């Protein structure tokens, strides 16, 4: 009886532990809520713990929430992931999609801009004087790497119309703004572009693909370093394996992978993002 009384307070404490997952808000909220709601259910079933998806208002909030310990597992872009990891000692990169080692951005334009597709990076200079939109200010594929490729050919943010670019906040928003003509051109996640094109959400009479960038590493999962202490020895490895084991042969897992636009998840490590860190420092996004 004494043993039962001694252990009784422990069980509720363990049961109260919730794995809090989140992600940068890079696409429309409805799509993200569906994706991470499904993923939370899948992880909860596999791990045997409650899993809650907590949406954030912007990219910076994802980094801040992770740094403060309010979020346990976050789907970051390349830049935000590096920022979050450097600000959170002990945190660990655990996975990326099969497409993330060689990711890419696209530059698009409204047909009325007069801009035409090109294969030479030097032709990015044609964007000077145009109304141009990036995505989020902290987006890797929607801002950091496009700005890097622009800088390589001598195009700075001050070269755009009104001496500054616009920031749409997400890839879907950039596409919508360029398609509507509010901006003459913009840059966004290449995979989002390809997906929306396939889904029939791009009006090719209004929008043209100008250029695809060279590849770079991008999105990845980062976990807090204290998960084994909170959920039990080996939990972080079990969490990683749960992500790596997602397969199209299971209906719910297939939907999750499709929403991630991935064939599967693969292992990743911090060194995979060394180039992103270097570019981030060169453009003043990491200090």
Name each model-derived stretch:
Residues 19, 27-38, 222-223, 230-287:
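An extracytoplasmic/periplasmic, membrane-proximal ligand-sensing/linker region
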Residues 25, 105-117, 217-231:
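A bilobed periplasmic-binding-protein/Venus flytrap-type ligand-binding module shared by bacterial periplasmic
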Residues 75-88, 151-152, 177-180, 184-205:
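A ligand-binding cleft/hinge motif common to bilobed small-molecule-binding domains
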Residues 91-100, 161-164, 197-215:
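Short beta-strand->loop
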Residues 53-64, 77-79, 157-176, 215-217:
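Short helix-initiation/N-cap motifs at beta->coil->alpha
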């Amino acid at each position: 009886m004494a043993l039962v009384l001694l252990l009784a307070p422990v069980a509720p404490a363990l049961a109260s532990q919730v794995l809090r997952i989140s992600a940068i808000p890079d696409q429309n909220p409805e799509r993200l809520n569906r994706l991470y709601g499904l993923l939370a259910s899948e992880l909860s079933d596999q791990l045997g713990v409650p899993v809650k998806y907590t949406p954030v208002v912007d990219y910076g909030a994802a980094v801040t929430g992770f740094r403060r310990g309010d979020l346990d597992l976050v789907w970051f872009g390349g830049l935000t992931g590096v920022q979050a990891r450097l600000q959170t000692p002990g945190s660990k990169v655990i996975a990326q999609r099969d497409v993330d080692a060689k990711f890419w951005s696209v530059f698009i334009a409204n047909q009325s801009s007069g801009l035409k597709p090109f294969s030479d990076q030097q032709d990015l200079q044609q964007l000077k004087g145009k109304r141009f939109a990036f995505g989020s200010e902290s987006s890797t594929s929607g801002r950091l790497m496009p700005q890097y490729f622009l800088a390589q050919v001598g195009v700075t943010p001050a070269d755009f119309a009104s001496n500054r670019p616009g920031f749409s906040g997400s890839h879907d928003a950039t596409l919508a703004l360029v398609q509507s003509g509010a901006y003459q051109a913009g840059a966004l996640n290449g995979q989002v572009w390809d997906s929306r094109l396939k889904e029939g959400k791009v009006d090719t009479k209004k929008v043209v693909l100008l250029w695809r960038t060279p590849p770079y590493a991008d999105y990845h999962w980062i976990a807090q370093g204290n998960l084994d202490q909170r959920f039990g020895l080996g939990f972080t490895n079990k969490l990683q394996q749960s992500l790596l084991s997602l397969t199209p042969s299971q209906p719910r897992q297939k939907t999750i992978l499709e929403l991630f636009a991935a064939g599967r998840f693969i292992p990743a490590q911090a060194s995979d993002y060394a180039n992103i860190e270097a570019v981030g420092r060169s453009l003043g996004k990491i200090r």
